Swiss-Prot record:
GO molecular function, one term: 2-oxoglutaramate amidase activity
Name recorded for this polypeptide: Omega-amidase NIT2-A
PANTHER family (alphabetical): NITRILASE-RELATED (PTHR23088), OMEGA-AMIDASE NIT2 (PTHR23088:SF30)
Source organism (scientific name): Xenopus laevis (African clawed frog)
Keyword list, A-Z: Cytoplasm, Hydrolase
Amino acid sequence: MAKFKLSLVQFLVSPVKSDNLNRACKLIKEAAQKGAQIVALPECFNSPYGTTYFPEYAEKIPGESTELLSQVAKECGIYLIGGSIPEEDCGKLYNTCAVFGPDGTLLVKHRKIHLFDIDVPGKIRFQESETLSPGDSFSVFDTPYCKVGVGICYDIRFAELAQIYANKGCQLLVYPGAFNMTTGPAHWELLQRARALDNQVYVATASPARDEKASYVAWGHSTIVSPWGEVVAKAGSEETVLSAEIDLQYLAEIREQIPIRRQRRRDLYNVEEKRN
């Protein structure tokens, strides 16, 4: 299939987990009814984002949130990239994205590889490593449309991860994310366009809607970028479902016109995975 519809659910996350789950499911169903074949939720879609919240909202996988995602994916017959939730496993906490197929099967579980530890004086300091542990595996899943690679938020800053996914045959990279009011306006779109252009892939980011009253204010602006580096769809800061057509024939044409994949000097340099 040369084309398919991707939808990103950007919704306002509240402190009430049940409200978040109900809202997410409602918007997922709306996207599916309008023809979406792959749907993605934002980072930390079931809980507020913050180191104090992660232990409070953490769940096992399978658990309440992921079981609900499995059910709605099966009900709608879609591929569902379940944003991320705080996951508890063997006494450790992870920022984890669970992906489900049209039959409700768990296809992949991506634990955020690169933890969000930054300190911009006078603007923002955040240390995910105060409560979270990093993941240590790549996350790729197959669909009838194309192969998809998954990262979470800060993972997008690392060009190597995107290149490894592209080398594995991914044509779409999806990053549930929650950039903030400092890094969002400066880097959010830039990083997406860079990853798309570098690897000649589609890149999509699903953000929570902006809540000015939250302790951590998300930038919003969920986005879909083409392999030409062009923004094909971009949300504002409010709650919405953003959709775009992913055109794999267009991707193939770009790769043929500018054949960087064949032109790389692997005799001089290479990016490779250390663990499978």
